[in-house]
Amino acid sequence: MPVRFKGLSEYQRNFLWKKSYLSESCNSSVGRKYPWAGLRSDQLGITKEPSFISKRRVPYHDPQISKSLEWNGAISESNVVASPEPEAPETPKSQEAEQKDVTQERVHSLEASRVPKRTRSHSADSRAEGASDVENNEGVTNHTPVNENVELEHSTKVLSENVDNGLDRLLRKKAGLTVVPSYNALRNSEYQRQFVWKTSKETAPAFSANQVFHNKSQFVPPFKGNSIIHETEYKRNFKGLSPVKEPKLRNDLRENRNLETVSPEKKSNKIDDPLKLEAEMELKDLHQPKKKLAPWKHQRLGKVNSEYRAKFLSPAQYLYKAGAWTRVKGNMPNQGSLNAMWYAEVKELREKAEFYRKRVQGTHFSRDHLNQILSDSNCCWDVSSTTSSEGTISSNIRALDLAGDPTSHKTLQKCPSTEPEEKGNIVEEQPQKNTTEKLGVSAPTIPVRRRLAWDTENTSEDVQKQPREKEEEDDDEEEGDRKTGKQAVRGEQEKLDVHEKSKADKMKEGSDSSVSSEKGGRLPTPKLRELGGIQRTHHDLTTPAVGGAVLVSPSKMKPPAPEQRKRMTSQDCLETSKNDFTKKESHAVSLLTSPAAGIKTVDPLPLREDSEDNIPKFAEATLPVSKIPEYPTNPPGQSPSPPHVPSYWYPSRRIQGSLRDPEFQHNVRKARMNNLRLPQHEAFNDEDEDRLSEISARSAASSLRAFQTLARAKKRKENFWGIT
């Protein structure tokens, strides 16, 4: 048989839900929002009872259920509203029957008001504990009709010590006044013991009278004021910082300094006697002088001079001048409006942006050469004198020409294609004095020139043989093979003259080197260039004493028309066969090899699309055509080669010095795999191109890397602390 009733647990007995002052005030707010609550259905206009939502068992009751529709004017709405507090029996066993009847009628009234049914305990423990507590019987008195007051008074006679308190509370509730609930401290929960409503809400006498008036009316529900306390327990118990006070004037502080602090009791007493209060106010006005109202513009509106306001002023207090905003302490008459200053700043920024844009778009060169062009050391490579025959040669080519003094290159003599290398040392032993005398220029003032130790020509021949070369070219066209023999004989005689002149160059070279060694250390590069000094090793290029290794961009001017060169008979056979081959592979091989210094290069990051015509045609300078045959160096004194044999350029043996130490002879008896030789007059079109072809690709690449390293170091040093 299932258990139909279960007693209250220990938790439910010890921790009962007590009706708090806050919950009661919340319930009263419902009545304030809905004034028609509690009226009869006929007063509300309802003519039929509501239908049930679902079929369920409805307990049968006596016809006394109609009492729920009766309205008792003396009972307030708060008496009808039930509390969810479970009632424990607190009366003795002798009065249990009477309480049963009261509870039964109370349940009937609760069903109409849709209030949940309260549980009731029949356990002995709850009876024993609740026998001494009559205060908890308030929940019953809240909902009992007026005709049940007799039974309630009869039950309170048993405990006479609580009669007066109970009657007073009952009368206050019947009148509709708020009653402070009283609880048993032993039954309160831990939360209720710690957080108790310290003070009850004091109701004004006028409000109490208004409540009584509304309670006596039959149809009008009582008016409930806003009894909800909008202050939480946290705000009441844990006070924060005091609110920031508004700034006051000194006059106000002086006037309020003598004001006495009045307690709430005294203040209430003064309010009760308005006549006495008015008299005191009149006396105070007579004694105190009238306060002068200062103009509104001179009053401070509570502005606090904070750190933010001191540091971050409005833009109107700044002046834009010289690209920066400066604070203006005083009013300047010609400062101008704020919009004008903003406009000046925006205009300046836009001008800078346009300048940067034009600076990038207006310069179309390889970015690898930027540091070379802007180098301050370019002045060290200027030509000291332009009185020589090479005055038309650009300074860029002179600076980049690493040949130096042609007499110094003993191992760089050109090998003929048919005979061994017998003329090498003889050419170097020729004096140079005749050359300088013919030109009429002193040796120290001669700029850097291209003197080919391996060539059959000298600089004197370039000046003196120019008309003869043109005449001989015309003779070749007219007479053909008949003139070929004469040219060979004449070339052989000129070759012997060159050998004699080169001996003097060698002697001068030794004197120059001895002078530099006596002074201690190597002479600066510009000084060596003026003296016609030698380039001993690659260190002379990469680590000069003065100026640094400077690589500049090619000249922007159009080079002069190509000179007519003398065509050798042995070159005619090579001209047609290898000319097409060079043009086909010029573009492909130039991209694989490192570019020589001074030769035009393709921009890796072009600003505009480069056409095929812009691709440098000087790439042929670095193009080899055939491998270099290795020839042993011959001792001096051997017979020179025939004059009709053509000379070729050997880029693999470009940087050689007079020092015979093997440490400095890096390229002796070495031949690069892709070093092919070109006819000298066929590979280039003008003087600059001719001289550019004689610049070593290997030395140019090494010097370029060295200069790039130097440029990066300088840039890192300059930008270490940021660009100012």
From Swiss-Prot:
Compositionally biased residues, Pro residues: 632-645
An annotated Gene Ontology molecular function: microtubule binding
Record field: compositional bias (Basic and acidic residues): 93-111, 480-511
Residue window of motif ST]-E-Y-X(3)-F motif 2: 189-195
Post-translational modification Phosphoserine, affected residues: S83, S123, S126, S242, S263, S314, S570, S594, S658
Motif (ST]-E-Y-X(3)-F motif 1): 9-15
CC terms in the record's Gene Ontology section: centriole; centrosome; cytoplasm; microtubule; nucleus
Protein name per Swiss-Prot or TrEMBL: Nuclear protein MDM1
Gene: MDM1
